[in-house]
Amino acid sequence: MVLIKINNIDFTLVDKEKLSSIVEGKAIPLIFIRKRGIKLGNLCLLGEFNQEISFFKGKNGKTLLPDMSDLYLMDGFNKQLSRDSFSNNYEKLYYILLVQMFL
């Protein structure tokens, strides 16, 4: 895992396989970047986001979706994503999962 700093907040870069160790109810900050998107510092893309985010499942089966108001497309400008536009465009996005160090 790679420790990075954004706005003086420490984050750990993880992939979706490591999400199984995150307990239900913890906030998971996400930054989604288009395939042609600009790099954010020296972060690397973990992979193409080509399936529904079914791995955000709690132990009781409840789907743990992040707050869509915190998700932005990084393609030269910030465009806030609505729930509808996210579910319609998820297959075109790459993902970076940023989990705060203290989780």
Curated annotation (Swiss-Prot):
This is Putative uncharacterized protein DDB_G0284711. It comes from Dictyostelium discoideum (Social amoeba).
